[in-house]
Amino acid sequence: MSSFTHFNDQGRAKMVDISDKKITVRTAIACSSILVTKEIFDKISHNEIGKGDVLAVAQIAGIMAAKRTSDIIPMCHPLLLKGVDVSFDWKQSEEQYRLLIEVKVKTEGSTGVEMEALTAASATALTVYDMCKAVDKGMIIGETYLLEKTGGKNGDYIRNS
């Protein structure tokens, strides 16, 4: 089992020792989405959701989630993040309204920020759901995935379309 970095010689979980890894600039971009009804789209667009400004609150939730990733993902190292940016874009087709979520995370350290970006994207989508569920519980959170990452000994990664 020693080929798995998160297991010790006894096959038990461990946090990987990163003290010998080189400190480099590391970035990650993760994406998610949430499919909503026209009613929810209109209410978000006109700031008519009873709980407040959905996108502003979801953006803050995403930033907070990135900062707290090591608290909820057991083997993630606590990181000093240099920046977190949560952005939104609407994609409309016929009667479908999809809120696209993109999260960019940056640090300078000895481990990557992929999990921070993915956690932030997930928390952002979950926050939109939470704030809008009184209007309609049928919203669908879409795929959450890593779009790209830079830095580290394994090099850069860019997701194929």
Curated annotation (Swiss-Prot):
Active-site residues per Swiss-Prot or TrEMBL entry: 130
Gene3D superfamilies tied to this protein: Molybdopterin cofactor biosynthesis C (MoaC) domain
Record Pfam families: MoaC (PF01967)
InterPro entries: MoaC (IPR023045), MoaC_bact/euk (IPR047594), MoaC_sf (IPR036522), MoCo_biosynth_MoaA/MoaC (IPR050105), Mopterin_CF_biosynth-C_dom (IPR002820)
Catalytic reactions on record: (8S)-3',8-cyclo-7,8-dihydroguanosine 5'-triphosphate = cyclic pyranopterin phosphate + diphosphate
GO molecular function, one term: cyclic pyranopterin monophosphate synthase activity
HAMAP family cross-referenced by the UniProt entry: MoaC_B
Protein name per its UniProtKB record: Cyclic pyranopterin monophosphate synthase
Lineage: Bacteria, Bacillati, Bacillota, Bacilli, Bacillales
Gene name in the database record: moaC
